[in-house]
Amino acid sequence: MKKIGIDIDGTITECPFIFSALAKGLLADDHEVHIITYRQEEERGKTIKELADYDIPYTVLHMAKAQDEMGAFKASVAEEVGIDVMFDDSLRCLLAMPKGVKQFWTWDANVTNSAPMMHIARHLGAGR
């Protein structure tokens, strides 16, 4: 079982149908899907509704506290939970990830695509 971290803003929000299909497939294969967002805890209700509207199933929703720094918050969640793969649009957050976390950068203004979904699926299927 792998533990997958997915950011919301700039990641899920940019292509919700892809992340809906990915999350459903991961959960069906007994992986865990952790939504790790810098949104504040006060926005939990709104965020849960938005994820439901996007049809994004997940195992746990991790939200920041006001005093948290974005990169450090996401890195601490990844370390605590044991995240294997992280999808995020923030290069700063990805660079802060603990050693060993596979990273998929989901956005760059100068890049028109990132890792193809088949490459991602092959990586997640490895070592089952």
Q: Which residues does each predicted region cover?
A:
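Hydrophobic/aromatic side chains embedded in well-ordered alpha-helices
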Residues: 1-3, 82-83
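Alpha-helical substrate-recognition element adjacent to the catalytic core
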Residues: 2-69
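C-terminal cap/substrate-recognition subdomain and adjoining C-terminal extension
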Residues: 44-128
